[in-house]
């Protein structure tokens, strides 16, 4: 359970909250922080679900069974890269481990693989890639698609 707000109130109720949740995470005084982090977590869940939908759309167009399409994740652990990639991006570190122009080539292959199947996430990501490349990030890491979402450096 994510909790934020005045510490005096948290101290008064934390024992009761511990009985309701296996994991209690007090985030500090900022009252809206728990709600913000909750929607950030849900956002990742939605992004993953959209990604799975797009994988299944490509699979459908290519005649690959859904079970076979998702079997790649028994060997390719994308979740394992999440924390490290997120930290790099959050710090504005776009040193390339997967160059954006190469990622955009793969994106073209994905869009082609989907054919006329409806896609959830890939077209929006492709547009953001094109914007980042146009803004000079082509040789940077794929994470540079988040550059416009970061605060301005001072």
Where does each model-flagged region fall?
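Hydrophobic alpha-helical segments
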Residues: 11, 153-154
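Helical "substrate-binding/catalytic lid" subdomain
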Residues: 33-145, 149-152
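Acidic-glycine-rich active-site phosphate/pyrophosphate-binding loop
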Residues: 14-31, 78-87
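Short beta-strand and adjoining strand-loop segment in the mid-core
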Residues: 1-18, 24-27, 40-48, 56-62, ...
């Amino acid at each position: 359970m994510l909790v934020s707000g005045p510490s005096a109130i948290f101290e008064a109720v934390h024992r009761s909250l511990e009985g309701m949740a296996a994991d209690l995470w007090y985030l500090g005084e900022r009252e809206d922080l728990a709600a913000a982090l909750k929607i950030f977590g849900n956002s990742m869940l939605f992004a993953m679900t959209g990604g799975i939908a797009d994988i299944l759309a490509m699979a459908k167009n290519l005649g690959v069974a859904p079970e076979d399409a998702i079997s790649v994740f028994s060997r390719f652990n994308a979740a394992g890269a999440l924390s490290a990639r997120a930290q790099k991006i959050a710090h504005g570190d776009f040193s390339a481990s997967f160059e954006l122009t190469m990622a955009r080539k793969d994106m073209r292959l994905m869009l082609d693989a989907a054919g006329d199947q409806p896609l959830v996430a890939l077209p929006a990501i492709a547009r953001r890639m094109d914007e980042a490349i146009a803004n000079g990030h082509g040789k940077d890491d794929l994470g540079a698609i988040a550059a416009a979402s970061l605060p301005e450096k001072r």
